[in-house]
Amino acid sequence: MLKSVNLKRAFRLTLMTYKLDFKKSALKEWKKLGSTLQQQFKKKLIERLEDPHVPASKLSGADNMYKIKLRQSGYRLVYKVEDDVVIVTVLAVGKRERSDVYRKAMKRSDV
């Protein structure tokens, strides 16, 4: 199930090329993050909504799935790009430890 996010309100921007959606479980993970981590991810998401296809961030073995890394904190955000409907869907947010965040994202992308 997808949860739509109002970007104008969330990021106070008026020009976006892609719409941002969260899987319900990813939104739950997002809300558990501290405000500092959320702000860091928001800044990167704003850039990615302009151009979500970043070759260096593409997940190997997954079509149209990319990651955003916060190196210092060890957190990752995994999203899927749907070009046909111009949507970026956040699939998972979490620590990189044992690659759990990537496994969650792969499962959620199939649902």
Predicted features by range, described:
Residues L2-K19, K28-K32, Q39, L70-Y75, ...:
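Enriched for short, Lys/Arg-rich terminal
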Residues I46-L70:
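A short, surface-exposed loop/turn module that caps and links secondary-structure elements
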Residues F22-P55:
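N-terminal first-folded block
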Residues S25, G61-N64, K95:
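Residues that form or immediately flank small-molecule/cofactor binding pockets and catalytic motifs
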